[in-house]
Amino acid sequence: MANSITADEIREQFSQAMSAMYQQEVPQYGTLLELVADVNLAVLENNPQLHEKMVNADELARLNVERHGAIRVGTAQELATLRRMFAIMGMYPVSYYDLSQAGVPVHSTAFRPIDDASLARNPFRVFTSLLRLELIENEILRQKAAEILRQRDIFTPRCRQLLEEYEQQGGFNETQAQEFVQEALETFRWHQLATVDEETYRALHNEHRLIADVVCFPGCHINHLTPRTLDIDRVQSMMPECGIEPKILIEGPPRREVPILLRQTSFKALEETVLFAGQKQGTHTARFGEIEQRGVALTPKGRQLYDDLLRNAGTGQDNLTHQMHLQETFRTFPDSEFLMRQQGLAWFRYRLTPSGEAHRQAIHPGDDPQPLIERGWVVAQPITYEDFLPVSAAGIFQSNLGNETQTRSHGNASREAFEQALGCPVLDEFQLYQEAEERSKRRCGLL
């Protein structure tokens, strides 16, 4: 259609609008944004090499706009409609996460951009969980929850209309895009008015806090929004000075020279006033603030090594002990880009330098990149991990629901049922990283 606005532009508008809304709803999130911005600035000022590296890898521009949100929905129809909504923003479902392994009755995917240019512009992601009613053991309660969910519509009538218009037209003009962002935002807004009476809320809450959070409100409010930092240990140590109480442990791998995957911490969930049906006042605890530090994406081989080491490490009682123990355990995981490349543990994006461009005819498909890197013809840049760690996600959920030590089981994965609810298969994160690396090699003439 004429004058259509791009998915990247719509995603950018939406992520900015969501951040502004969440700042109003949860003022501590605004404090967190300021703290993260200060820490990132200090890290880049003290490390010119990192600054230059991030500029060259097109990573710097995205740093300050980078966010991920998390939401929870109750029905297959809600999930499928969200898939249509996020597609308009150029966000697609990547990976399947089974959080039942940590006693959380949901399974999830991450809606995110998948091509290089979109990720470089704004890598906004939304970790989206679907409640698994079949994991509610009490049959009467299970039926009641299903009935409550059947009666709500988390999308405004105009939002549904705009979804239809987009799919018929194949795009939005600027006016439609702006209206869509505002209507879509309503789905994620916090509502003080619960849709149930206090007795129903308590019954669902006693089954699992998260069930009450999903079932008892009119929308799928954001339960956290997460900025990206370059030094999560520093943010964690400074949070109390800003009047923010952090969770006990930083989730994920230890601090390293070459960060891998994802490290996360958060502050405790807020206790918020709610009004139950019948105007009875009460409180609900669900929404919190989170911070993340992202590293390089690992290959299946690297991920297997990570999972094995993490399993052996266990968890400590306090963050300092836990981090020291993790660093000791992870000594066997190579901590240099060269070794990780040589051992096939991580994904890299290859680029020709000006000197490499001048010698392009001397580079052939199948050449080993290492001699070309040493010659200064090629640079290898770590590909940022854009996804999530199921155990960390579950750990964040648990700690913010007031339980840091929930036992972890083998879970009860049901990817097929999730994809059926979603209306399409989820994309494979490993395949996306492999394709990104191969695209870069092809551009250099290495493939």
Swiss-Prot record:
Cofactor(s) the protein requires to work: Fe(2+)
Keyword Iron found: yes
MF GO annotations: dioxygenase activity; metal ion binding
Residue pairs linked by disulfide bridges in the UniProt entry: none
Keyword ATP-binding: no
Residues that bind 2-oxoadipate: H68, R72, H224, V391
Residues the entry annotates as binding Fe(2+): H68, H224, E290
UniProt enzyme class: oxidoreductase
EC number: 1.13.11.93
Pfam families: HGLS
InterPro entries: HGLS, YdcJ_bac-like
Signal peptide range in chain numbering: none
Site (Important for substrate specificity): R72
UniProt keyword annotations, A-Z: Dioxygenase, Iron, Metal-binding, Oxidoreductase
Entry-linked PANTHER family: 2-OXOADIPATE DIOXYGENASE_DECARBOXYLASE (PTHR39479:SF2), PTHR39479
Family note: Belongs to the 2-oxoadipate dioxygenase/decarboxylase family.
Record function comment: Catalyzes the decarboxylation and hydroxylation of 2-oxoadipate (2OA) to form D-2-hydroxyglutarate (D-2-HGA).
Name of this chain's protein: 2-oxoadipate dioxygenase/decarboxylase
Source organism of the structure: Shigella flexneri
